[in-house]
Amino acid sequence: MEVFMDSTHTFIQIHPKDNTAVALTSLKKDSVLNLDGRMYTLLEDIPQGHKFALEKISAGSAVIKYGSPIGYATEEIPAGSWIHTHNMKTGLGDLLEYSYQKEFTSLEPQEERFFEGYRRTDGKAGVRNEIWIIPTVGCVNSIATSVAARAKEFQPDSVDAIVAFPHPYGCSQMGDDQEHTRQILADLIRHPNAAGVLVLGLGCENSNIEELKKYIGAVDEDRVKFLVAQEVEDEIEASLACIRQLCDYASTFQREKISCKELVIGMKCGGSDGLSGITANPTVGAFSDLLIARGGTTILTEVPEMFGAETLLMNRCRDEAVFDKTVDLINSFKNYFKSHNQTIYENPSPGNKKGGISTLEDKSLGCTQKSGSAPVADVLSYGQPVQTKGLNLLSAPGNDLVASTALAASGAQIVLFTTGRGTPFASPVPTVKISSNSKLYENKKNWIDFNCGALVDGGSIPEMGESLFDYVLEVASGRPVKAEEAGFHDMAIFKQGVTL
């Protein structure tokens, strides 16, 4: 029998109200644990990231984690027992009635910090000097990728990357899907990380260049080039000629000192485990507070992973108008699920469950740790550019690539992506992979940029948040993330309706 007297390195009770604790390392049956003088004997093995009961939980009673219910016991759970999907279930139902119960404190202003970025002619700040090739329709994807590959032969050092963003849409779409495609493409065309953009069309698609221009608005003709493949003899050579001009234009920009208040940072998680809500997500939350306290902006999305934690965000809304928008954000996504005859609460993936996440409430309460403690300043519809500094909520699904693309489309120059299982994906902007556990960091150093697993062995969330803030300023100043070093750039658009 082992006796663990130092709970800091073996398990944690996240909130004083919790009737559960989380194993920070794998714990063996019959181990005796000490929590502030209270002794617990484990009745079974507890894998890392998984929960065990700190007291007897009767059948039908709430299982408490993060100070909030994450479901209810389906049978009596003795103290020291493993708690997971075999003995607990979600408590979520359908639409709820909400009331505004204001509960937040404003952040104390922090000393201004700076990064070395690119000042665009429209006044926006970018963190990369790239050339983007944006197809209007999937029919020209191969042309776009071929042009990007060939253009690398003459890419100047002043250009960070020449990237194509293929996608399967732009035609055979109707209604909201067609609107979403046009809006997201227009958002990316205007993004400040792109020094120059080639908009590549076919000519006969629904979202043709003339239609897309209505969404883009006025453009700098030196920065944005348009090419219709059906209207030129050799679309490859014509595209390459455009890219050469864009490279010359991009070379006129140099990095300069810019205030961090101009940073817009997206926040996302995926492949989460039981430690994500204890290490990585709270660290991102601490980062978010630090940036907002300096006048910057963060965006939180993946709305289905707010279900079960939405009231915490609602009560942090800065006023009733933002509260009403947040209620609509949540209920609209619940109605989206219901319109497709899908249950609202069947979210945690097999990987989530293997990592210790038992219910959607469990996942959501961990997920929303990324929001820190700042008031919710605004709520954005899908594809809507950010307009208000501070913490913004964005309407987008939980899918990693769709949500991360939506963050970039709303103006994020960088995305912070926490994970407990690991993923190699990228988004249109630098995507910082943040591990919740050190094992992932050690095993996947070609994927992971920043490790929060060290918090299991000590250290503090505020200190880790400061370290992450310093790291993000380095990335904003040009330090490549692992996905960029691998040459990865991806995008995806939210689809809801029929395909013609």
Predicted regions and their residues:
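Short secondary-structure boundary segments
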Residues: T419
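Metallocofactor- and cofactor-centric catalytic cores in central/energy metabolism, strongly enriched
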Residues: E2-I414, T423-P424, V429-L500
